[in-house]
Regions:
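N-terminal positively charged helical leader segments and presequences
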Residues: 1-89, 249-252
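Short acidic-hydrophobic, aromatic-tinged amphipathic segments that line or gate anion-handling sites
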Residues: 8, 53-57, 151-160, 216
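Active-site/ligand-binding-proximal alpha/beta "capping" segment
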Residues: 174-228
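Short, glycine/polar-rich helix-capping loops at beta-to-alpha or helix-loop-helix junctions
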Residues: 40-41, 133-139, 202-208
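Structured adenosyl-cofactor binding patch, chiefly the S-adenosyl-L-methionine
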Residues: 120, 141-145, 209-252
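Short, ordered loop/turn segments at secondary-structure junctions
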Residues: 33, 58-60, 131-133, 179, ...
Length: 252
């Protein structure tokens, strides 16, 4: 089956795509300096060996990113989408795992930044509605800084039925809301969990929130109304990563 191709831009996005054996890279457009940098960063393997490489000036590369007003840094690539992981298969053998679910979060920069944080702190995956996911967005790939290659992204057609099915499989669903019952650090965070985040402007929709078992919040200054969604998520991911590491050291 032929997969649709699209363009990505930026040093980290392009280099990590080249390093990923599961990512088909069709063509790479580079400045001479960018090519040298790729070889410096990959001294043991020529990641450009099986790829069509075209050398361009920065001005020539601008045409690929001018619409998004994106800085390419001398790196542009045409790639195919990765195979989609299957959520049901993934959770079959898992005793402990954490997923993130975004509700009405559509800004590609925010999604990309959140993906970067999730991959950095070893979250198991992102669950997102197919039609709300900007899967071809250069902005998202640039904001993710190469982490699109390191996080499972589960695209589903019906979020509510997915949450219902996960709850039936012993997942706890935590909705993050400024009016939550308690601070998220008071939760033990054991077993299987789904972290449910709403959009910055509108929060979580009521009919999605009804699938949450608990509502929790991030305690912060009363003078500040809210945090950016990607910042909020990064705080939570770091805390969960810390607890996981602490538990591992304790049981070592």
């Amino acid at each position: 089956m032929n997969k649709s191709s699209f363009f990505i831009a930026g040093q980290h996005a392009v280099i990590e795509a080249l390093r990923n054996p599961d990512r088909k890279v069709l063509r790479v457009f580079l400045t001479e300096d960018a090519k040298k940098n790729i070889h410096r960063k990959n001294p043991r393997k020529n990641v450009l060996e099986d790829v069509k490489v075209y050398f361009k000036s920065k001005k020539e590369l601008d045409k690929y990113t001018s619409k998004e007003q994106l800085m390419h840094g001398g790196y542009v690539a045409e790639v195919e989408h990765l195979d989609q992981p299957d959520l049901k298969e993934y959770i079959k053998e898992k005793k402990n795992c954490t997923f993130v679910r975004l509700d009405e979060v559509t800004d590609p920069r925010n999604i990309g930044s959140l993906i970067r944080s999730a991959a950095s702190f070893q979250i198991d995956g992102l669950i997102i509605k197919e039609r709300h996911f900007p899967k071809d967005s250069k902005l998202m790939y640039k904001s993710a800084s190469g982490c699109m290659e390191h996080l499972n992204i589960f695209q589903v057609s019906n979020i509510n039925s997915t949450l219902k099915n996960l709850r039936e499989r012993n997942f706890w669903v935590y909705g993050f809301d400024a009016r939550g019952d308690k601070d998220f650090t008071e939760v033990k965070w054991e077993g299987k969990n789904v972290l449910l985040f709403g959009s910055e402007g509108f929060g979580m929709r009521e009919h999605t929130g009804k699938y949450a078992d608990f509502f929790v919040k991030i305690d912060m200054s009363k003078d500040i109304e809210s945090l950016n969604i990607s910042n909020s998520a990064a705080i939570v991911f770091h805390h969960l990563s810390y607890l996981k590491k602490k538990s591992w050291l304790f049981n070592k």
